[in-house]
Amino acid sequence: MPKLEMMLLVLLILPLSYFDSAGGQAVKVDGHGDGMDRYLQRDDREARITCQPRGRSKWGRCCLTQMCGNFCCPRYGCRCVYRSGRGHGCSC
């Protein structure tokens, strides 16, 4: 099988939950809540995080900045505000 076909096959097989178009980090919760802690301990990161579980799934989405609705704000210091007619948005 040529390399291009193999790459396409791999991309089709990978679950889409690994990719987050809103910029969040997909994290598997292990039931004790320390999965994200271990992620942040790498490279001595000091970050405040916000996480949002997804129903009964073990997967959730976490932001290293402020979470606003279903996406992450672009940088630290932003606030999540609700704008009537447009929904949630970041105010930086």
Curated annotation (Swiss-Prot):
Under the GO molecular function aspect, what terms does this record hold?
A: acetylcholine receptor inhibitor activity; ion channel regulator activity; toxin activity
Q: Which family does it belong to?
A: Belongs to the conotoxin D superfamily.
* Keyword Secreted annotated: yes
Q: Which organism is it from?
A: Conus fergusoni
Name this protein carries in UniProt: Alpha-conotoxin FrXXA
Top-rank taxon, per record: Eukaryota
The signal peptide, as residue positions, is 1-24
- Disulphide bonds annotated for this chain are 63-72, 68-80, 73-90, 78-92
Q: What are its GO cellular component terms? A: extracellular region; host cell postsynaptic membrane
Q: What is its main location?
A: secreted
PTM text: The homodimer contains 10 disulfide bonds.
